């Protein structure tokens, strides 16, 4: 029996290479740092779309971005891996990326209806 259908979740190790995960991790930290600098120096408003925010209510004071182009591309790369392991034809909808820091907690929650099946990818940590 398909493990995803039986347990309603899967752990897939090495869904992407270490090198790609490390690249994505460092990209996102650099984007966070650049966005912080641009906010502090008034180059962009905290409300300018695409740069990210520290105002997500689920994990306050933690940098997050909805629909980052690189992460959307990564989602499409992981799609065939997810379809293979779930044995489902999946429709990608969106990405949401957070740079968790020590002490952050994401409490159990329900995602929006368009997110019937989610993928969480650990890209790295310090």
Give, region by region, the residue ranges found by the protein language model.
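Conserved hydrophobic/aromatic beta-strand scaffold that supports enzyme active sites
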Residues: 9-11, 96, 118-122
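Catalytic core of non-heme Fe(II) oxygenases with the double-stranded beta-helix
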Residues: 102-126
């Amino acid at each position: 029996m398909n493990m995803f259908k039986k347990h309603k979740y899967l752990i897939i190790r090495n869904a992407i290479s270490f090198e790609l995960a490390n690249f994505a991790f460092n990209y996102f930290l650099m984007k966070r740092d650049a966005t912080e600098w641009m906010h502090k120096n008034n180059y962009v408003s905290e409300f300018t779309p695409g740069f990210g925010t520290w105002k997500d209510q689920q994990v306050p004071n933690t940098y997050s971005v909805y629909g980052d182009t690189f992460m959307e591309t990564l989602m499409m790369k992981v799609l065939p891996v997810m379809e293979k392991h779930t044995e489902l034809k999946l429709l990608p909808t969106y990405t949401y990326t957070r740079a968790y820091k020590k002490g952050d907690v994401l409490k159990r929650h329900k995602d929006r209806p368009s997110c019937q099946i989610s993928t969480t990818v650990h890209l790295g940590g310090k």
